[in-house]
From Swiss-Prot:
The active site is at C178. This is tRNA uridine(34) hydroxylase. Catalyzes oxygen-dependent 5-hydroxyuridine (ho5U) modification at position 34 in tRNAs. Residues 124-218 form the Rhodanese domain. SUPFAM superfamilies: Rhodanese/Cell cycle control phosphatase. The keyword Oxidoreductase applies. It comes from Pseudomonas putida (strain GB-1). SMART domains: RHOD. PROSITE patterns: RHODANESE_3. The gene is trhO. GO terms for molecular function: oxidoreductase activity, acting on paired donors, with incorporation or reduction of molecular oxygen.
Length: 310
């Protein structure tokens, strides 16, 4: 790869009794390796996306895998020319991906992992119910052909959607997917708890599918939303054509950028009529700072913070 920056999405469900104590040394390991991005720590494990040079990512992964609990931490890689994150952060959370249902624990029960090479055959089975576990704005960018869109705004809405629409006695085979594998893994644990028997999820998520399945064999339609400044990636993991509205976080395409309601860093057609005046003024000020820093060839104005956050 010619690109200078490696982007690594990583996670693992594993009991971390000392996750609070891990926060500071993990942050220091990121700083020592010049890694940017955000990692989440919780009792149930670790999750996040980070970026650095090849050497920096390898250094952080080596540090993580020095802990026997994280020796097999799952990670997917893609590449870009510029640093896609501004900050280096470690946050403490109740959940590394928030479902909001007590007792759901992938460390205790989880669905059947499906390797990317076997995914096409599974979802081509007419008896399989294929569910996209991501949020509505992510699904709008791209999804697998034939997948059901729950139209959820957050993952917290997923349990109610399942209860309202599906029955374990009628839906015998369920396959789920998400960006990097973590959300659908937790969703599979929830589904098993609700009585669904045959529950499958894409190992490594969409990003691993892009890595391993040739584009000519792909059943994916569109781009994949990613949680960094690239906004989306194509099947070949190159950066897509979408931008992101900094006010509402919604992805926006070229047509939406041409709208009279689009103002870079301030508003877009999805949010222009819902923003409060206070939010709009704050966004305008923020954008001015960004443009001024860029014109003076200075670091991004929100890029100075190194944080270990509770």
């Amino acid at each position: 790869m010619s690109q200078a920056i490696v982007v690594a999405a990583l996670y693992k469900f594993v009991t971390l009794e000392d996750y609070i104590e891990l926060r500071e040394p993990l942050l220091q390991a990121m700083l020592d390796n010049n890694v940017k991005g955000t990692l989440l720590l919780a009792h149930e494990g670790i999750n996040g996306t980070v970026s650095a040079t090849r050497e920096g990512i390898d250094g952080l992964l080596a540090w993580l895998r020095n802990d026997p609990r994280l020796v097999d931490v799952d990670h997917k890689e893609s590449y870009c020319d510029e640093q896609p994150f501004y900050r280096t952060k470690v946050k403490l959370k109740k959940e590394i991906v928030t479902l909001g249902v007590p007792g759901v624990d992938p460390n205790q029960a989880v669905g059947t992992y499906v390797e990317p090479k076997d995914w096409n055959a599974l979802i081509s089975d007419p008896e399989v119910l294929l569910i996209d576990t991501r949020n509505d704005y992510e699904v709008a960018i791209g999804t697998f052909k034939g997948a059901i869109d729950p139209k959820t705004e957050t993952f917290r809405e997923f349990p109610e959607y399942i209860k309202a629409n599906f029955d374990p006695s009628k839906h015998k085979k369920v396959a789920m997917f998400c960006t990097g594998g973590i959300r659908c893994e937790k969703a599979s644990s929830y589904m098993l708890g609700e009585g669904f028997d045959a529950v499958y999820h894409l190992k490594g998520g969409i990003l691993k599918y892009f890595e391993e399945v040739p584009q000519e064999e792909s059943l994916w339609d569109g781009d994949c939303f990613v949680f960094d400044n690239r906004v989306t990636v194509r099947h070949d993991l190159s950066e897509g054509e979408y931008d992101q509205c900094h006010a509402c976080r919604h992805p926006i395409n070229a047509q939406e950028r041409a709208s009279e309601h689009y103002s870079p860093g301030v508003s877009c057609p999805h949010c222009w009529d819902t923003l409060s005046e206070k939010t709009r003024r704050s966004a305008i000020d923020r954008q001015k700072q960004i443009e001024l820093a860029k014109a003076r060839n200075l670091p991004h104005p929100i890029g100075y913070n190194y944080k270990a956050e509770a």
